[in-house]
Amino acid sequence: MNVLSCSMNTLRGLYDISGVEVGQHFYWQIGGFQVHAQVLITSWVVIAILLGSAFIAVRNPQTVPTATQNFFEYVLEFIRDVSKTQIGEEYGPWVPFIGTLFLFIFVSNWSGALLPWKIIELPHGELAAPTNDINTTVALALLTSIAYFYAGLSKKGLGYFSKYIQPTPILLPINILEDFTKPLSLSFRLFGNILADELVVVVLVSLVPLVVPIPVMFLGLFTSGIQALIFATLAAAYIGESMEGHH
């Protein structure tokens, strides 16, 4: 009962964290609900970029691929390689999920550095990358948790839960807490890195507005891509782990 209570408290804490506000926010009132408009607007922009890129990629495929087609094929192969390395031979059905996570996070992170969100004025707050908001990163982490529970249950059925008493039943509380803390580590790692990167750039621009921030911005682009890769790789690793049934 203590383990179950602790797990429920962890989930409740994660839900509360998803409501944390950093700075001012702009909301839409829809019925009896307040909708976080800043995150929705920037997320829609990112989704539009991804859908537009996908349309360009599949619009007119050539037998002899063009440079653009080569680029998109390379991205697909890269995502497939990451999925296969972490999940194993049954990686196929999970490539779309891992690819969606990677591309959404990658474009979101880069949008914070490349798109001039700040020039768009809002009644309250300001626009920023979707992954600059804890609500987005918690949602992505919870989706990952649902995915690896589904992967384990779909392959092993209720026998999936036997992993919690391996290699010894003494580790039951630790194994349960491990699964419930994975979303916390995923969400806070991504949120903290993106928020810190944008804050550093803003501070440097305010102090030395011309030359100094440029190298930091390039470093931010690099770390943003690395964070997207880390998130997608860990998500694939968790899914592969749940299907294999060992740690």
Curated annotation (Swiss-Prot):
The keyword Membrane is annotated on this UniProt entry: yes
A GO MF label: proton-transporting ATP synthase activity, rotational mechanism
InterPro entries membership: ATP_syn_F0_a_bact/chloroplast, ATP_synth_F0_asu, ATP_synth_F0_asu_AS, F0_ATP_A_sf
Pfam families: ATP-synt_A (PF00119)
Keywords for this protein: ATP synthesis, CF(0), Chloroplast, Hydrogen ion transport, Ion transport, Membrane, Plastid, Thylakoid, Transmembrane, Transmembrane helix, Transport
Cellular location(s): Plastid, Chloroplast thylakoid membrane
SUPFAM superfamilies: F1F0 ATP synthase subunit A
GO CC field: chloroplast thylakoid membrane; plasma membrane; proton-transporting ATP synthase complex
Membrane protein topology class: Multi-pass membrane protein
Stretches that traverse the bilayer: 38-58, 95-115, 134-154, 199-219, 220-240
NCBIfam families: ATP_synt_6_or_A
Family to which this protein belongs: Belongs to the ATPase A chain family.
Subunit annotation: F-type ATPases have 2 components, CF(1) - the catalytic core - and CF(0) - the membrane proton channel. CF(1) has five subunits: alpha(3), beta(3), gamma(1), delta(1), epsilon(1). CF(0) has four main subunits: a, b, b' and c.
Role description: Key component of the proton channel; it plays a direct role in the translocation of protons across the membrane.
Name of the molecule in the record: ATP synthase subunit a, chloroplastic
Organism: Citrus sinensis (Sweet orange)
